[in-house]
Amino acid sequence: MASSSRSEKRCHYEVLGISKESSPDEIRSSYRRLALQRHPDKLMKAAGLSEAEATAQFQELVHAYEVLSDPKERAWYDSHRSQILFADHSSAGGSKSGGSVPDLFAFFSPTVYSGYSDTGKGFYKVYYDVFNSVYLNEIKFARTLGLRMDSVREAPIMGNLESPYAQVTAFYNYWLGFCTVMDFCWVDEYDVMGGPNRKSRRMMEEENKKSRKKAKREYNDTVRGLAEFVKKRDKRVIDMLVKKNAEMEKKKEEERERKKKMEKERLERAMNYEEPEWAKAHEGEDEGAGLSELEEEDDDAKRKNEQLYCIVCSKKFKSEKQWKNHEQSKKHKEKVAELRESFTDYEEENEEEEIDGPLDSPESVEELHEKLQEELNIDNEERDVKKEVVGEADETDDEYFVAEEDMQGSSESEDEDDEMTLLKKMVSGQKNKQKNVVSKEEDEDETEVEIEGDTAEFSEFDNQKSTGRNKEAKEERNKQNAGNDMADDTSKVQIPGEGGNPDENMNATESASGALADSQKDEANSMEYDNRKSTGRRRRSKKGKDKNNQGELNEKSSEADDTQYVNRDMESQDYKKAPRSKKSTRGMKTKGTTKKNSSNECDRCGEEFESRTKLHKHLADSGHATVKSR
């Protein structure tokens, strides 16, 4: 019986006439070719076989193609091919290794059943007996080992063609997820108790565990593979798949019909639609709308092409999100703060230039020149008044003043020359500043060159002016003190004149005091103007840089023109020599020390004064002037 069963079994590759390395396309083409040759009708006519034999050969061909066309079944068949070919289906109730495990490989073939009945060799009878034997073996092993009865779940019944589909689903779900409770101790390779030492026994135990695990995994895979094999050929499952496919096709057809109907209705509504009058747009508006859309598209394209760029940090950004994150960064905020501070400093400097603006214009230079000339005229008038007052008081002392004027004439002329030189430099410097400002506005990007000569002249001029102001302030205090003394003694003392008229002497005294007060006011205004002017020069001296060599040539030519201009003005004016210069005080004192009588003591009354000015005022008021012998 066993030999006959083995002779009936053939390898699937042999049935299809292909090799084990054949591709799915080769398997398909071979099956189609053999299906035409081994059709039952052709076999009965050509070979003269019976209908049963012809049908059996054709079913063998179909079964081989079904197994090898499925990648999973083909892989499982390749790994268990020898066991399937040499297994005996009659040992299903028996066992291997002491009857513990039933032999299931013999049932991976359609030859074990005939028809789908639940009796005899029917499909449901044969496979029910196989799965029932597996379940009973699990119960027996659990009882032998003393395991709990709930460790083995109850298996659903396979049923027949009349069973509900829920029972079919439950049956296959149970066996597709099967897991045995057997430990497969009979597959041990080594006898652990016969080990010579502890280490060897431990190694034997490890090898036996691996063998048991492998046998258990193979048994579970065999049972699950058999369940999948049976499900694929179960007529109930096949009929349910056909039914489900028919329902799916029906639903798809209904969905297509519904969509067609909806599309048809939509087209009908669109054809019957009439636009109301208020919704009709004029052609011009449509064109305008089209142009606006094109402009919007162009703007969008420009925005895409535009790159986000941070001017402060000199960085480019690909997205607006990166740009916003950069604006919130600490480095960006610090650089923005620095830039804002630099802008603020620049604005403050511009405001300072605007405050000093009138000094930089040509009109301001002319006004400055006129004002300086007026100051010179006022100084000349003041000196004339002083000369008249002193001349009237010291008429008897002409020889004394003539000798003193001869000794001081040279120093006074030198002081006047120094003062005119400073005046020329000041006027020239003002015009040079105006041209520097204009050239700076026109050529902002050219190289800045510092004019050391002008800076040196301005610094020298400032030093001389500051020294002169200190001396003028000291003389002004002396004049104020002398003026107060003169005001107190005016009503008591008469200045002797040529005619000896007291009224004329009083008028001369009053005119002298008025001229002295006016000169003091003018000197105060002049000092305030000089202070403001020197402050503006110091503020602009930091920025007094020329732009190019042409600016230097223009400065030199303008300086020469200004010098000629000042000389012409000086020649047109009738300057009178002052009897005593403000800046000649040092020279006068130096020359005075060479005289025999260097003390400030009155020869007549013997009173000593702090300065020669007070001594002269005392001589003028008291008439104690005497003629000195040569």
Swiss-Prot record:
Gene Ontology CC, one term: nucleus
Span list, region Disordered: 197-218, 247-302, 319-604
InterPro entries documented for this protein: DnaJ_domain (IPR001623), DnaJ_domain_CS (IPR018253), J_dom_sf (IPR036869), JJJ1_plant (IPR044648), Matrin/U1-like-C_Znf_C2H2 (IPR003604), Znf_C2H2_jaz (IPR022755), Znf_C2H2_sf (IPR036236), Znf_C2H2_type (IPR013087)
Biased composition (Basic and acidic residues): 247-283, 319-328, 469-479, 519-533, 546-559, 568-577
Residue ranges, compositional bias (Acidic residues): 284-299, 344-357, 391-420, 441-460
GO MF terms held by the record: nucleic acid binding; zinc ion binding
Naturally occurring in which organism (per UniProt): Arabidopsis thaliana (Mouse-ear cress)
UniProt biased composition (Basic residues): 534-545, 578-594
Keyword Ligase: no
SMART domains membership: DnaJ, ZnF_C2H2, ZnF_U1
Name of protein: DNAJ protein JJJ1 homolog
The encoding gene: JJJ1
Places the protein is found: Nucleus
ZnF endpoints (C2H2-type): 308-332, 600-624
Major location category of this protein: nucleus
Pfam families in alphabetical order: DnaJ, zf-C2H2_jaz, ZUO1-like_ZHD
Keywords tagged on the record: Metal-binding, Nucleus, Repeat, Zinc, Zinc-finger
